[in-house]
Amino acid sequence: MSDKNEKTEKNERLSVFKTYKLYVGGKFPRSESGRVYEVTDAKGKWLANAPQSSRKDARDAVVAARKAFGAWSGATAYNRGQILYRIAEMLEGRRDQYVREVAEAEGLSKSRAAAQVDAAIDRWVWYAGWTDKIAQVVGGGNPVAGPFFNLSSPEPTGVVAVLAPQESSFLGLVSV
């Protein structure tokens, strides 16, 4: 094949559009509605398709989270910290990809996007470090009137829904 034909073939190639799926219970199911919506960057340029979730999808996510709750709340603080630290390691390993995607999605310069990604990674490490310390800081004996003891200890309590803010979505999602 000649160089001219090779260049023409590359230019005529269609790009493959990314359509994301949900992440529920360790799997990537399609939305029950089968619908998607466009995700655009700060300038309105198309980035990807995202699933438009239905009530059933939300219910399935809550059921899966409740199913996983026993294992998560039963894990030691040290183990939970190791899991959070592993998330930070994985983000660090794909830092360049996250910097590129945050810059595209939010219309930021590479340096500002890198600062946001670095702050998000640092925050995961910070959270991981606090998992085995929070009980000593927040929990403990509470003074009460009379011959009683009032002890408190923080424990996981259940399913939480988190929505990322419109501005600074990646760092905002990690910070919530």
Where are each of the predicted segments found?
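Conserved small-residue-rich beta-alpha loop and adjacent elements
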Residues: V137-V176
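N-terminal Rossmann-like NAD(P)+-binding subdomain of aldehyde/semialdehyde dehydrogenases
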Residues: S2-P147
